[in-house]
């Protein structure tokens, strides 16, 4: 289950090339079409915009997924648990959670009064909450961007992106770069920068205020040579960083 190129990339470096060939990807139209069309097998959900439509979608998917995708119960499930379709696809099956950004390090409490209706209508993950707190999440793969919340430490494994990437075969690395349309010239240009800031939609997700987000980035980039800084903006991040 993927919605961002970030999580997709992490999944690809965590598995072998033969596993990639046999993976069925559940995604939404948030994942760029140029990437989706290169996936070996996938289903793209067109997610509703209105709030009550989104609730109906989650209920509908939870009850129809076993009929539409019967192979799920026999599969190893990877991905994030914070997508609109996560609970309906993962259901009560074991899930290996793959980092999707800073939200994995900031657990959001779910209203306990809604546990039973959510559990009945939308599944275990919807009832328990996101970030790996559900008992169906057996393992959490994180890169260590921030300290891991105590609640999920016991089932969290920290891995190095660089080490995982270097262990891949050259042919598989080339295939991954092709999937994301990464050209050799672009990689050479990126390598000329000293620092890269990958932004996150923290304001859009209601995690912090705009002022706090900017202060966080300023702290992270303190002492950084801005002429050698590359900013990679998250697809859902609406901030124009050229103004700051």
Segments from the language model and where they lie:
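Short boundary motifs at domain starts and secondary-structure transition points
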Residues: 15-16, 67-69, 181-191, 221
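A short, charged/proline- and glycine-enriched loop
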Residues: 19-20, 72-73, 186-197, 201, ...
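Signature of uroporphyrinogen-III synthase
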Residues: 210-218
């Amino acid at each position: 289950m993927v919605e961002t190129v970030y999580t997709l990339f992490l999944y690809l470096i965590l598995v072998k090339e033969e596993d990639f060939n046999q993976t069925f990807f559940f995604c939404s139209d948030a994942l760029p079409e140029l990437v989706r069309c290169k996936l070996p097998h996938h289903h793209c959900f067109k997610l509703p915009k209105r709030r009550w439509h989104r609730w109906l979608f989650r209920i509908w998917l939870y009850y129809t997924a076993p009929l539409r995708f019967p192979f799920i119960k026999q599969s190893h499930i990877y991905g994030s648990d914070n997508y609109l379709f996560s609970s309906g696809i993962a259901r009560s099956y074991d899930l290996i959670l793959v980092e999707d950004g800073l939200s994995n390090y900031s657990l959001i409490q779910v209203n306990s009064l809604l546990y039973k209706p959510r559990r009945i209508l939308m599944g275990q993950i919807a009832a328990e909450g996101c970030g790996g707190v559900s008992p169906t999440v057996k393992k959490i793969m994180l890169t260590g961007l921030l300290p891991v919340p105590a609640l999920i430490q016991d089932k969290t494994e920290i891995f190095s992106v660089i080490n995982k990437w270097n262990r891949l075969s050259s042919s598989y690395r080339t295939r991954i770069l092709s999937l994301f349309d990464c050209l050799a010239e672009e990689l050479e240009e990126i390598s000329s920068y000293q620092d890269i800031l990958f932004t996150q939609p923290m304001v859009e997700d209601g995690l912090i205020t705009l002022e706090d987000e900017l202060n966080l980035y300023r702290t992270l980039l303190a002492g950084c040579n801005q002429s050698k800084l590359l900013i990679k903006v998250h697809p859902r991040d609406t901030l124009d960083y050229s103004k700051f």
